[in-house]
């Protein structure tokens, strides 16, 4: 099974992958202090998407190469880069992370944001990222929170779909710990970093959350057949709206940013 493309999800991507600006800025401050661009200038981001991580890195002085298999995502990333007059510091290439068209030992940092959940041969992607890092380079696994997602609604969507006979494709890892264990088997060490100032609570409107699922804003809904999808949405609407005080009810979702550093 191939890596999952986010073509078709571009319109709602940034809207549904939000994070607290203050917490994100704090995390980027930590990253910049730990890996100053004067010493670690060349950054690779496979799965660059719309550039929501790459562009802040460029603004901090890094030279970023962003890869994605989604042409729609790359077009939006390039447009946003031009709008910020940052295109000289961000190179966008269409490529699959399992076959990087890049020289070995050519990057100081490689940033992967939730990426390995969407690559069937994720071990090959890990090996490729380690290959293009220089001997003192670091693979950075960055978790930016749930965005506009309500985890229990997503889980219930998948439960109902399975009850209706749909089998979800198993694209990649189920947990980042699989990546950590795999890199350990290759002789790499991992360091997890969590900070209290990287935690926040997101208030999400119930109807908005249901609408995002209805509109297939998340990758796991992308290939669900229409008949199953709409039956699931009807079930979710019935289960949740009848129990809520109003469709405008808000759900509080704990969120956090975490960083895992993998290096020799």
Task: Please provide the spans of the model-predicted regions.
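Conserved Class I S-adenosyl-L-methionine
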Residues: 50, 190-264
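A short SAM/SAH-binding and catalytic strip from SAM-dependent methyltransferases
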Residues: 108-121
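A short acidic, Gly/Pro-enriched loop at the edge of an enzyme's catalytic core
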Residues: 98-110
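A short glycine-rich, Lys/Arg-flanked "PGG" loop and its adjoining helix->strand segment in the class I
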Residues: 123-135
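Short alpha-helix
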Residues: 171-187
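Conserved class I S-adenosyl-L-methionine
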Residues: 1-41, 52-56, 73-76, 80-85, 138-170
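Class I SAM-dependent methyltransferase SAM/SAH-binding core
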Residues: 42-46, 50-99
């Amino acid at each position: 099974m191939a890596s999952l493309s986010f073509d078709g999800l571009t319109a709602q991507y940034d809207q549904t992958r939000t994070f607290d600006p203050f917490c994100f800025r704090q995390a980027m401050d930590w990253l910049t202090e730990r890996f100053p661009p004067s010493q670690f200038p060349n950054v690779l981001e496979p799965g660059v998407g719309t550039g929501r991580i790459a562009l802040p890195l460029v603004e901090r002085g890094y030279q970023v190469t962003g890869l994605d298999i989604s042409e729609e995502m790359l077009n939006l990333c390039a447009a946003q880069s031009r709008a910020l007059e940052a295109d000289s510091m961000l190179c966008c290439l269409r490529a699959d992370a399992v076959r990087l068209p890049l020289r070995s030992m050519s990057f100081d940092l490689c940033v992967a944001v939730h990426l390995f959940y969407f690559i069937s041969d994720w071990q090959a992607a890990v090996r490729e990222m380690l290959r293009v890092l220089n001997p003192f380079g670091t693979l950075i696994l960055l978790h930016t929170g749930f965005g506009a997602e309500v985890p229990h609604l997503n889980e219930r969507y998948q439960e109902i779909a399975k009850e209706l006979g749909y089998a979800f494709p198993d694209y990649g890892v189920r947990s980042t710990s699989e990546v950590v264990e795999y890199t350990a088997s290759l002789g790499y060490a991992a360091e997890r970093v969590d900070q209290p100032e990287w935690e926040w609570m997101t208030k999400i409107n119930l109807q908005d959350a249901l609408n995002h699922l209805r509109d297939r804003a998340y990758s796991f809904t992308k290939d669900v057949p229409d008949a199953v999808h709409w039956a699931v949405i009807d079930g979710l609407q019935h289960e949740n709206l009848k129990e809520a005080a109003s469709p405008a009810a808000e759900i509080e979702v704990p969120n956090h940013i975490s960083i895992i550093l993998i290096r020799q």
